Every structure is written in structure tokens, then in C-alpha cells.
Amino acid sequence: MTLIDNHEAVGMEGVPRLSEASARDYFELLKPRVMSLVVFTAFAGLVLAPGQINPVIGFIAILCIAIGAGASGALNMWYDADIDAVMSRTAKRPIPAGKILPQEALAFGLTLSAFSVIILGLAVNWLAAGLLAFTIFFYVVIYTMWLKRSTPQNIVIGGAAGAFPPMIGWACVTGGVSVESIVLFLIIFLWTPAHFWALALFKMGDYGAVGVPMMPNVCGEATTKRQIVVYALLTALSGICPTLLGFASLGYGAFATALGLGFIWYSLAVLRMPEADKRMLPAKKLFAFSIAYLFAIFSALLVDYMIAHVWLDAGGII
């Protein structure tokens, strides 16, 4: 029996018991690094949206989105406990490390999921709550349980889950979905493949050991490198769309263009990387830059908004 077929067996033998997990262990179950990116992009969507929202309601909205993202992470770790135990990158996560039992993680994730969606609906609006519920479902069921272990396109399709937060933040203010919020979605959606395939290149051994069909393992390094360049180009183009569509300034557009060129440059370095190169430094550099890129793009959008709607409205001169 393979690890994938046996994922339910992890930690399920013997008499049911409770773990002695600490608050820190449960916090790690929420994938705080991923949550920080989710919270930041959701906050950007909330701020950039036209209209006003009560600061307290806005805080509740961001908190609910953060809790929903954490719930998704907990459910992902519950389902993936079998492969997490084998992969070097994930072996120290709370479940494979024996700090939290799988059934505890499942209950924790389901409880937080329901709480975040219900409170967001009651306190903000039900469209935002529905989008949050769909995001959790998409990440846990569509990506984690289905796509991740069945197709090398897992990241391409599954990346939608990570792209919804700014759209949810936008819906919290406006109660709707617009072209602008779809553009914010697309920036993250198109960014995701290059980001994760860079990781998959230098973690091929881990993914191969557990049978997860990542692009490099199934289609080879050469195909993966070409696909990374394609998605880097698409990401760079999506990054300047806010200016092209008129909801960001030329200053932002110039900054996004420079960032996009950097993304493309790093992707081309990966393309030129010899297959015999076991260190894969270009892939590691692209992975690191891609994280900085996304934070920089959404930070620039926020700064651009503040200049246009706060400082200039107050009588500043640019």
C-alpha cells in the first residue's frame, strides 16, 4: 500500500487519546506564513475597494478571513499527514511530529471553518461569507483531496484558492465582485504556478518519494522551466493591469513593470539552469523573489491608493 493510499492510517492506531499539544502547536497548524500572505492581500482588497466600511467591521472581516485561511491549512495538514511525514520540508509539522492527533486537527479545522464563515456572514455580508466558504472548500476538497495527488496541473487549477482573498476583501466593502477585484484575483492566480514550480524543482526528491505528481516529476525539468517562463510573463502582464484599467497610477505601473521584468529575469535564469545542477540556486532565488514580488505588488497598490485618495485629497501635491 502506498503512502497516498494509506493517509488515513497516520496516528489512528490504538485507543483514542488526546494529545498534549500547546497553543503554539495549534498555531503552527494554521500555516501562519501562508496566512500572513492571505491576510495582507485580503486587506489590500478591502482598502482598494470603493466605498466605506466601519473600521470595527473591517477588522472583523480580516479576522474571519484569517481564521478561514488557518482552518484551510489545518484541514490540509490533516489530510496530508501521511506525505508530510516523509517530506523533509514538512516532517516537523504538528501532526507528523506527533504533537497533534489527526482527529484533533480535523475537528479544529472544521470548527474554525464554520465559525469564520458564519461570523463573516452575520457581521459583514453573505456574499463575502460565501466566497470564503467556497475558498475553503476549493482548497481542501478540490485541491488537497483531488488535484494535488492526481495531476501535474494541481497548482495551476488549485491556485485559485489562494487568489480569492483580495476578492473577498473587496466584497466585504462593496457587497459585489468587479473587474478590479477580478484583476487582483488574476495577479495571484497567474503568479502561483511559477512560484510553486520553482519550489518543486529543488524539492523533486520529496515529491517523488510520496508520489505527488508535480510538474517536474511528471513532465521533466525542461518542460517545467519553459512553463515557469510563460507564467512569469503572464504574471508581469497582470501586474500592470491595474494601471491599464485605470485604477492605479502611472507611477504604480512603472514600479510593477520593473518588478515584472525582475520576475521574468529570474525565470530566464531558471530556464538556463543546467539539468545537472543539483544545487538549483536559480530556482531557489526565483522562489524567494516571487514571494517578495507579490508582497511588493500589493504594497505598491496600497501606497498608490493612499497617495491618490488620502494625501492628495488632503491637499498634498505630487
Swiss-Prot record:
Topological type in the membrane: Multi-pass membrane protein
Sequence intervals crossing the membrane: 34-54, 55-75, 95-115, 118-138, 155-175, 182-202, 228-250, 254-273, 287-307
Signal peptide: none
GO cellular component: plasma membrane
Subcellular location(s) per record: Cell inner membrane
Protein's GO biological process: heme O biosynthetic process
UniProt key word Transferase: yes
Key words, A-Z: Cell inner membrane, Cell membrane, Heme biosynthesis, Membrane, Transferase, Transmembrane, Transmembrane helix
EC number from the UniProt entry: 2.5.1.141
Reaction(s) catalysed (UniProt annotation): heme b + (2E,6E)-farnesyl diphosphate + H2O = Fe(II)-heme o + diphosphate
Pfam families per record: UbiA
Enzyme class, UniProt record, top EC level: transferase
Alphabetical list of InterPro entries matching this protein: Protohaem_IX_farnesylTrfase, UbiA_prenyltransferase, UbiA_prenylTrfase_CS, UbiA_sf
GO molecular function: protoheme IX farnesyltransferase activity
Metabolic or biological pathway, per its Swiss-Prot or TrEMBL entry: Porphyrin-containing compound metabolism; heme O biosynthesis; heme O from protoheme: step 1/1
Coarse class of the protein's main subcellular location: membrane
Note: Carbon 2 of the heme B porphyrin ring is defined according to the Fischer nomenclature.
Functional description taken from the UniProt entry: Converts heme B (protoheme IX) to heme O by substitution of the vinyl group on carbon 2 of heme B porphyrin ring with a hydroxyethyl farnesyl side group.
Protein family per UniProt: Belongs to the UbiA prenyltransferase family. Protoheme IX farnesyltransferase subfamily.
Protein name: Protoheme IX farnesyltransferase
Species assigned in the record: Sinorhizobium fredii (strain NBRC 101917 / NGR234)
Gene assigned in the entry: ctaB
